[in-house]
């Protein structure tokens, strides 16, 4: 595979922990950084990325069509949400058969091997059954989690299983981090979360009250705290040294209580 193309797999051992939000957030920030980015929706149960980006009306084809031979360029939505360089391959209903796993792997391998994108981000479903099959094709894997003990335990499990399946550079992203709850409810702080998961943390995304409203209207956040967090994560993935909560004045002031 061409070394110039960066390939990132997003996974989680359970649903509802910010996986698809993270996939969209990182892909959008990579495109805003000037990188031609392909975002692929392999969550064949939720199939939510076209909705999160407001592109339902343009999602005429998807991953299952590419599996069955449709050219990728004919299935991809370009300039998603008005962001130049952000492209989306939606998920569509896929019928499993005896050869599905092999065709899935071959199709993903072909997609991430293309040299016409700078960055490829692949979102998978809650649970790691699909992620395990395709993990070896990626440079890096992100596992998402929230603050709860069950979510952190699931992240640790997912990270270990994906590493056993050939995943490399496996990192943790903590989503919907509720700073007041660290003291009020004695929930896990950042250091405790990292210790519990045994994964290197590449970013913490604060709880963003604006996020749900933006997603419901099919808009990708920009200039919100969650968008700033994903911008920081994208820059770290590119090798930049970015402090935790950089650019988030309120979070930086309260950083000591979050650790």
Model-derived features with residue positions:
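P-loop/Walker-type NTP enzyme "switch/lid" segment
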Residues: 42-115, 216
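C-terminal boundary of histidine-terminating zinc-finger modules
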Residues: 214-234
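Conserved catalytic-core segment of NTP-binding enzymes
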Residues: 113-115, 119, 124-207, 212-213
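Short, well-ordered alpha-helices that flank and scaffold nucleotide-derived cofactor binding pockets
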Residues: 24, 28-32, 136, 160, ...
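Short, hinge-like loop/turn segments at secondary-structure boundaries
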Residues: 55-59, 161-162, 188-192, 219-223
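Acidic-aromatic/histidine active-site loop/patch
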Residues: 1-7, 170, 234, 240-259
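Short amphipathic alpha-helical segment that frequently serves as the phosphate-/nucleotide-binding helix
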Residues: 20-25, 152, 187, 227
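Walker A/P-loop NTP-binding active-site region of P-loop NTPases
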Residues: 7-71, 119
